[in-house]
Amino acid sequence: MGVPIGDLVPRKEIDLENLYGKKIAIDALNAIYQFLSTIRQRDGTPLMDSKGRITSHLSGLFYRTINLMEAGIKPAYVFDGKPPEFKRKELEKRREAREEAELKWKEALAKGNLEEARKYAQRATKVNEMLIEDAKKLLQLMGIPIIQAPSEGEAQAAYMASKGDVYASASQDYDSLLFGAPRLIRNLTITGKRKMPGKDVYVEIKPELVVLDEVLKELKITREKLIELAILVGTDYNPGGVKGIGPKKALEIVRYSRDPLAKFQRQSDVDLYAIKEFFLNPPVTNEYSLSWKEPDEEGILKFLCDEHNFSEERVKNGIERLKKAIKAGRQSTLESWFVKKKP
């Protein structure tokens, strides 16, 4: 879900071409959830193979990753590890919301209301370990780097970006900024036309670039104050934040208070200072490799077509596109190296 500070954050629309040659660390769980939510049939049922196993996420990962590679982007997917203990309440809340949405989905189906059914089906989306392992396997077969975070994937992606190993972190959530990512790319995996909920209207969704330094300059605060602001309005670790405090009021509080959390700690059932410390110093690892390899053609065909009933013709076409994108990327890198070497 992430922290609700979007109204305060300056951001600008960009084209995929603006990210040409850039390495991007993508929040894998966030992307998988998006694919599972959006790649569905009219009644909200996800794509499945002949054995009833969900494949929406595999379709999304395969074709969207190829699109990114064709745009000259080098994607790496960062997977979540163990969540912090104080996230348990939010995870339980999400589970209950999914169960309620699933009941409403079935009710809408029984009434023949397909639009309502699809809406609730999206809200009922859940990601289990099997879906994650399938996603990892596909990405490895495609030659795409995967990184296993010790805890939050967004924290690991932000760390990689802060080191300069990648250009930016990619996620729909703004938490990456709290974790210190110098740049955040939103809408990277959902770019294109999307239907507005409840309306027969389609809108064009484009990637957005959010630069941490520009955010802090616009709000006239430090990153530490941005974290305090987020805690006041609510994060995944203290859902809902402080009652009655929205983003604008929280901004005013953190600007003029040396220790804005002190006043509200007494009325909170979680340690607000522990949450702040987690954002400042989350568990991360240096054990990762950013190496893009040739795809395993036979492995991809076996996994997607033989095991999950994907169209062999479409998958073969996708593999060819992927190979061309990798070759073009290497050629571009070689040419830029020679340009730099010229006297």
From Swiss-Prot:
GO molecular function term, any single one: magnesium ion binding
A biological process term (GO) from this entry: DNA repair
Keyword DNA repair: yes
Taxonomy, superkingdom: Archaea
Keywords: DNA damage, DNA repair, DNA replication, Endonuclease, Exonuclease, Hydrolase, Magnesium, Metal-binding, Nuclease
InterPro entries: 5-3_exonuclease_C_sf (IPR036279), Flap_endonuc (IPR023426), Flap_endonuc_arc (IPR019973), HhH2 (IPR008918), PIN-like_dom_sf (IPR029060), XPG-I_dom (IPR006086), XPG/Rad2 (IPR006084), XPG_CS (IPR019974)
Ranges for region I-domain: 116-258
Residues the record lists as binding Mg(2+) 2: D173, D175, D236
CDD domains the record matches: H3TH_FEN1-Arc, PIN_FEN1
Disulfide bonds: none
Signal peptide: none
Sequence segments annotated as region (Interaction with PCNA): 330-338
Role this protein plays: Structure-specific nuclease with 5'-flap endonuclease and 5'-3' exonuclease activities involved in DNA replication and repair. During DNA replication, cleaves the 5'-overhanging flap structure that is generated by displacement synthesis when DNA polymerase encounters the 5'-end of a downstream Okazaki fragment. Binds the unpaired 3'-DNA end and kinks the DNA to facilitate 5' cleavage specificity. Cleaves one nucleotide into the double-stranded DNA from the junction in flap DNA, leaving a nick for ligation. Also involved in the base excision repair (BER) pathway.
Subunit relationships: Interacts with PCNA. PCNA stimulates the nuclease activity without altering cleavage specificity.
Name used for this protein in its record: Flap endonuclease 1
